[in-house]
Amino acid sequence: MNGRPDGSALVTGASRGIGAAIAKALAREGWPVGVNYRTDEDGANGVVEEITKAGGRATALQGDVADPDTADALFSALEEEFGPVLVLVNNAGVRADGLAPMIDNDDWDRVVNTNLSAAFRLTRRALRPMIRSRYGRVVNIASIVGAVRGNAGQANYAASKAGLVAMTRTVAAEVARRGVTVNAVAPGLIETDMTEGLGENLLEHVPARRAGTPDEVAECVRFLASDGAGYVTGVCLTVDGGLTA
């Protein structure tokens, strides 16, 4: 652990895609990892198996972060097995796209609750153990949609991600003196299930002329969760191949 306090890392929405890549990256750094999933048990178990085979420690944790009771349940389970959660990555997210007149209240509430409110509840639950340890890393997975720009058909998603960045900066200022950093990563076009079907329209606007990979996003999270990023807080790091340059 290189002098860090003993503890664990929790990654939400980690059964596949960006979340799975982040879980594996943190495990390579020596963190025991809680691999949270909502429905994809096989995917989460596959991530745990890969981490374990590589010499790391991990456990699969079922829970829907949209449920207000899930935060305590996830933390209690992980704390019992691996110790206090000192790295939290709020990655779980959903989309329910549609032009503003067509977004009903349920789709608005579901996206904002999962992408923003759940991240706040998990962060709130994480902060006290981190403050007691005088060490903590919170990384929120935002998006260039909302964090940097709007996108037609995604008013609910953009609002949730813009709010996530605002929350990141505010909480970062509150806990900076306690050895706790709070940052965000805003991916652009990344090869995942959530972005499938968007690539052809966007790729021609990406200066890098390619989509990013989950591993490239995970590497940014790995840095922000590291000892070397102790003076980096309140930042939103875009990972978009120059799309918003």
What are these regions (language model features)?
Residues 15-16:
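Conserved glycine-rich cofactor-binding loop
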Residues 99-100, 104-112, 202:
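Substrate-binding pocket helix/loop in short-chain dehydrogenase/reductase
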Residues 120, 213-244:
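C-terminal substrate-recognition "lid" of short-chain dehydrogenase/reductases
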Residues 123, 160, 168:
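Active-site helix of classical SDR
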Residues 128, 173-174, 230:
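Alpha-helical segment proximal to the catalytic Tyr-Lys
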Residues 143:
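Residue(s) in the substrate-gating loop at a strand-loop-helix junction
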Residues 176, 181, 232-234:
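Short, small/polar-rich loop/turn modules that mediate ligand/substrate recognition or access, typified
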